[in-house]
Amino acid sequence: MSFVVANTEFVSGAAGNLARLGSMISAANSAAAAQTTAVAAAGADEVSAAVAALFGAHGQTYQVLSAQAAAFHSQFVQALSGGAQAYAAAEATNFGPLQPLFDVINAPTLALLNRPLIGNGADGTAANPNGQAGGLLIGNGGNGFSPAAGPGGNGGAAGLLGHGGNGGVGALGANGGAGGTGGWLFGNGGAGGNSGGGGGAGGIGGSAVLFGAGGAGGISPNGMGAGGSGGNGGLFFGNGGAGASSFLGGGGAGGRAFLFGDGGAGGAALSAGSAGRGGDAGFFYGNGGAGGSGAGGASSAHGGAGGQAGLFGNGGEGGDGGALGGNGGNGGNAQLIGNGGDGGDGGGAGAPGLGGRGGLLLGLPGANGT
């Protein structure tokens, strides 16, 4: 027996994009029809008339073919939209009969652990801002609540298989919520919530456990709080999450990988402070994450250092310093085989970053910043 898994939102979105594309092409063909189907002769002689008639015939043939292509395009979009509606209807139809079965399956674990066996965790609410944990076997963690006052709720953790919930956005002056941990066997960590500005820090991205990527840290868009650090990748495989940027505080550090995977990029510091350091790569293989930039313009922030490479991989590049005297970050080192990361450029009177060391067996050192 074969099974089909369809994301109805993606299918509907694709149908809408194709419909808009078809409308644009039809409008372009209509605009060009007058100039291409009735070409005026360059002169009164027979040769000019024959050339004009030839090009006009080509234009008319093109319009006929375009009309046929537009009809096929319209039929395809209708079929795609109908398929999305059919999948959505099937899901809605199946939900009712299957819900009692899920209730029976989840009843023992709900009674013992207050957690379902299968199913996604509920999103946070004003009364309980933290997202609920997903099912022990399969299920994503719920997203944290974004309140009008106070910190954002934390994302819920996944079970054995599933992704962690995203942290909620903090209110003015409050921190964003941390992302939830990914599934024990497979799943990505949730993204940290953004701060509401005015001093709040972005939430830390959730980490993966065995296989999966760490979640990105939350942004501190216009306050003095730091950007959230990226979550760590899974123990066996997975990239670290990217650190987030901050306006006045420091950028968040990129998450690290453990055995196989790339380190996450550090977050930028947009005005002052220091940009986030790039995450280190997995021990055996992976590239170090790039250090965050001290940004340009009226910034004195220092660039973040690049992350260290694995045994096989390249070191991360150091971030550039801000234009008003920020130091460039040092490039990350390679280990056995790989190139060192380039050092970041210093801004104004800021010192440039040093290039990372090349691999001991094979590899070039990174260039120093200027």
Curated annotation (Swiss-Prot):
Record-level GO cellular component terms: cell surface; extracellular region
Alphabetical list of InterPro entries matching this protein: PE-PGRS_N (IPR000084), PGRS_rpt (IPR048996)
Effect of substituting residue 65 to G: Reduces interaction with host ubiquitin. Shows enhanced viability, reduced p62 aggregation and reduced colocalization with LC3 and LAMP1 in BMDMs
Disruption phenotype: Deletion mutant shows enhanced viability, reduced p62 aggregation and reduced colocalization with LC3 and LAMP1 in bone marrow-derived murine macrophages (BMDMs).
Subcellular location: Secreted, Cell wall; Cell surface
Family of the protein in this entry: Belongs to the mycobacterial PE family. PGRS subfamily.
Subunit-level organization: Interacts directly with host polyubiquitin in a UBA-dependent manner.
Record's comment describing the protein's domains: Contains a eukaryotic-like ubiquitin-associated (UBA) domain that mediates interaction with host ubiquitin.
UniProt name for this protein: Ubiquitin-binding protein Rv1468c
